[in-house]
Every structure is written in C-alpha cells, then in structure tokens.
Amino acid sequence: MKLLRLFFTLFICLVSTSGYAANDDKPFAEKKIVLQISDPNPFKQTLVLNVANNLVKHYGPDKVDIEIVAFGPGLRLLLEGNSNESRMNGLSKNGVRFAACENTIAGFTKKLGYKPELVSQATPVSAGVVRILELTDQGYRLVKP
C-alpha cells in the first residue's frame, strides 16, 4: 500500500509539472511575475493589463517574465471579442503569457450551453489556482491588482 501511494505521488508530481512549463524564452529575465485576475469588473481587468504593460515598459520585455492567470469570473478577460483583445495581442508580442482555467471554462460551458471561445493568446491550464501555485514554486511573485 505504501509503495502504491509513493508511485501515485510521483505520478501526480510529474503530471502537474509537465503540462505547461514556464517560459524558457526569457533566460535573462530579472523578475518573474504572475498576475491573477479573478474579478469580473472591467476596471480590474484593465488594471491587470496596465500592470503588465508597466512592468514590460520598466524592465524591458527581455528582463521580465509575466504570466496573467485568469479564473472564475476573471476568465471574461480571455473570452473572444473582449474589448481588450488588441492590448493582449500587443502584450503577447512582448512575451506576456495568458493562462485560462479549464475548470472555469467547464463551468461557463455548463451555464451557457456552449463552450466559449478564448482569445488566441490564451493557453488553457487545468486549474488557475494550481497554475499560480506552480509558478510561485518556480520563483514567480504573485501580484493581484
């Protein structure tokens, strides 16, 4: 039984870290930031994009590694047709990544009756909170504007 538990624990560790690795395209990044958006308020969604933009401007795109993780009502930021889509495109060109919680997508799908489309910059992750924990374990600092 202990051996089975050990194998199960090792399996979970391998699976949880293999799906969506941190950005290896920024080997010279001095700062690693994960921005959380879980609020439906458009002001907060704009604010999280402003923070990302300010960080890129201050440090330069090669010196800061940023991932915006959206879950719960904050997922609306990453839905196709969002008024901030062009801003996200610009941030993405500067290396900012966007993660969309699959648990929230499933909840939206159930409520809406169809799966909502995400902006092209968004990458689905199994759970937004888990993604944040993975990144903080890798040295990222959590900022929740």
Regions found by a protein language model. Give the residues of each.
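Bacterial N-terminal signal peptides
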Residues: 7-16
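Secreted/extracellular ectodomain signature
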Residues: 20-145
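Positively charged n-region of N-terminal signal peptides that target proteins for export
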Residues: 1-5
